[in-house]
């Protein structure tokens, strides 16, 4: 009995120890759960960071694939590595979700259940133990009473005593068994907690193992990358193939830089020069409808630092730009398509140094260029053959006297005075802006945008009385600036809003083919808009890049002999604002000329005459072959007479800039000078009508049928 009691006491103590252990484990479980929650939060942040990292990694891989130097093998390997990392990131996301859904949340719920179950076990065990102990105590007391009676010898009590002792022993055995069952339940409860924890942990570990299994695939990829990038200083065959393929391709690189800083903040010429402009975002085939000129072709864009391949083009461009400077510098340095427009214009430089440099340049080109042996041509690819011209020595030899050395200075002074007029006001025109406006991309006076596709031509004269007068005495390819004093005379006659000008590619053809009225005289300069099949493209405000600005061209026309054998009525070789005339006897190179840049056609010829050797570069080289000795002498005389009149034009130009209009009497003495008639003899010198007389006479527009809302409305 005592032994059984001791065993029951030992079992009860064991049960109580187990229950106490379970109760003391609650803080540990709760701490684990909180730490798991923190891990889950960090893993979520890691997943987001991994997604951003892999997006950037993918861009690097794509760049390696598209870069010529990295080769596609490196890019492909990087792409595969990025894909493996994305798979790892997916498994990491699954592991993070499993950590929260399979471990943290269920474990938190089970901890509460475990607390309840442990308390219930303790209560049940205590209740059973007390009941058993109470029964044993009661039975034991009865047994003691029987023992006392048996000792006194009262009756036969021994069988009852033995039965009572057996009942007490049975009760102790029952209590012992009850304690053992209680201990088993406690052990099962404690074990069940860890089994449940393993059940919760299994999905988390499985997700982690799957994620780590993806990492093993990175070994082969990194081995391939190490082999591909073993020698960074040696080009692989794929990169060598890029160089070989480049030889047969046609590339034209354009290097463009922002223009110089504006002189004042109020100037419309100020541009966003502080912003980096894209190099080739402007389409070279799209006409600039609101600025009045065609965008610069990348073929003619010259880099700031010339490469070896540009040496020949620079030579030809210097030859082309020197033609206008030989006869009074009517075209500034930035008007040539191949000139560097990032340099300051002639109005931004000191006048003394500009004139001296131009004079030295003219003298140098006169000394180095050959005599007039043939006319140059302009090919479709933009390359120019150096054009020949009659040197001053040849003119002096044929004319009989030497040209005055001050003629060149007078010409440059006159041209500079006329070219500086475009600085006075640029509010009404976008021709001198850099291609953007504060409100709209159309001109300020235009009411609508001009689509690239049109169905008609609008033709209006800028030559005054076209019905009674002959060819004008200024160049037919001149472009009148909108904001000069010349344009002010036009505005007096046109009391309407300024139309948005258009520009396109010139096409060669006869006047009838271009829509010119048959009754129009050959000297009427027209501005016509040609229908285009290109889609409507509006110029962007600032993404189109800087636009080279061409200063106004005000050339002087040298009179020619209408009855000379080589003289034929001029024909159209251009269209729109770049109006140009050539002879009907032009060589077959004229169609190729029409395909060239319109700005190339806008350059006036050197002699400003229709029969000079320089015209052969525009209208073909056949004029030189047909010219006779008498014609050359007549041309020399015409040029000399033009130089003599330049002195008088200087005073008139300065007076014109001040608002006065004094004109030499020699230029407008007789009406026959304004309306020249064919002389009876080819050797007679026809009087010259200069540009100032045409300005004084004014301009009269001819009505045409058009439905273009941007065309000028003649009141």
From Swiss-Prot:
Residues 687-704 form the WH2 domain. The keyword Cytoplasm applies. Residues 253-405, 420-485, 527-562, 661-690 are annotated as: Disordered. Residues 253-274, 284-295, 312-330, 429-442 have a biased composition (Low complexity). SUPFAM superfamilies: BAR/IMD domain-like (SSF103657). The modification Phosphothreonine is found at residues 257, 606. This is Protein MTSS 2. The gene is Mtss2.
